[in-house]
Amino acid sequence: MVKDVTQFNQYLTEEVVEDYSDGIIGRREALRRLGMLGLTAALAGSLLAACDAAGQGSASEPATGTPAGSVPAGPSARSTESITFAGPQDRKLQGAWAAADNPRGAVLVIHENRGLTDHIRSVTGRLAASGYSSLAVDLLSEEGGTASFTDEAEVTAALNSVPDSRFVADMKAAIGELETRAVDAKIGAVGFCFGGGMVWSLLAAGEPRLAAAAPFYGPLPDGADFAGSPNAAVLGVYAEQDERVNATREKAAEALEKARLTHEIVTFPNAGHAFFNDTGQRYNPAAAAAAYQKLIDWFGSHLG
């Protein structure tokens, strides 16, 4: 089942086009990825042609890899443990778990559209090093887990085929697992890009167990209503140069105000989409360091 094109399918499509326009992937790869998301060759070609007409995009294959000298924001990551736990309808969910020595709280980590990667494991371990026992859930557990795919474009396409209701159910099950592993701890959630959108979706679905949430540059679901998550203090993280996601920033603030949730919207200057990912081409060390400190301060205020 393909998602509603007006929501996450559109978001994932725009991510591919943006990667092409920024020169991160070439035309052939962009066409391949758009096709995997269900676009016809004609539509995919027209989207890339619009970038070409604007003087953007790369017909050749660009350089790939992590920017030289990238240092992740925050402390050195604790090691994570691969775990399985009970999910909805007798399904088994996969995840990465990192326990803090003296937990101040517990955090659910939601991955980007590349799945449960080493980068997300690192974020999970860094949060544990900062005092928050953390669990990153693999939202492709039913498909065999992220590790069962050899191509990140296949991961994105697989995520695109899953109904949002299953994602929400799996995230709620992961919160239940956190309750078991971190007894009496207040629980927060953080997600990045696609995962940021998932945090918004979790809040909109209603999750009273959340005491804090921090969606990083994630798309806001249409008609989001956060009344069912009355206990969540929400830190919305945006990037100054991320016009695509920033288009929903005002609506997010309005929805938070309407639900009367404690919240703060922060936009980091001179930073683009995915600026926190130290393995990506848009990594901004200064913005990432500031965002991590802001996140830990937020959790400190609302989790302990």
Question: What kind of region is each of these model predictions?
Answer:
Residues 156-180:
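Alpha/beta-hydrolase active-site loop
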Residues 236-238:
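Short beta-strand/loop motif that positions the catalytic acidic residue
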Residues 64-99:
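N-terminal cap/lid segment of alpha/beta-hydrolase-fold proteins
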